[in-house]
């Protein structure tokens, strides 16, 4: 049994990240056997920056960052606001299709780690 239940999830910004979050948190929806019922407002962002370039000025190393802000609402009152950030460095690839696949896989792994932290945070409230 869970110690909390999620009534509603409002998702803002990055669609792919939000879909993954919503899917992972759905096991906590509408559990009547708990005393804590939360509404969540979740905003997520994904960014990619160049960390270094080669001698030709082409990107050599990238930084991928995923940030998620969560507002936990209980009885129409904000109970907790928290930001979660994860990032990863990776080398450029000549095959842009492979680069995109790697970026998406890396972002997905970062989101998984943040989801674990979100669940721990909700359990601690």
Describe each model-derived feature in a short phrase.
Residues 23-28, 32-108, 112, 116:
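Surface-exposed short loop/turn segments
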Residues 118-125:
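Amphipathic, coiled-coil-like alpha-helical scaffolding segments used for oligomerization/assembly
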Residues 1-37, 47, 125:
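A structural "domain/chain start" motif
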């Amino acid at each position: 049994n869970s110690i909390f239940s999620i009534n509603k999830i409002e998702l803002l910004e990055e669609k792919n990240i939000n879909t993954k979050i919503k899917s992972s948190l759905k096991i906590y929806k509408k559990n009547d056997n708990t005393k804590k019922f939360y509404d969540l407002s979740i905003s997520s962002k994904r960014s990619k920056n160049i960390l270094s370039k080669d001698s030709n000025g082409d990107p050599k190393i990238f930084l991928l960052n995923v940030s998620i802000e969560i507002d936990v609402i209980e009885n129409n009152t904000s109970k907790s606001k928290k930001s979660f950030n994860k990032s990863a460095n990776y080398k450029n690839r000549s095959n842009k299709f492979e680069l995109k696949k790697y970026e998406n896989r890396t972002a997905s792994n970062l989101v998984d780690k943040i989801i674990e932290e979100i669940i721990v945070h909700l359990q601690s409230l």
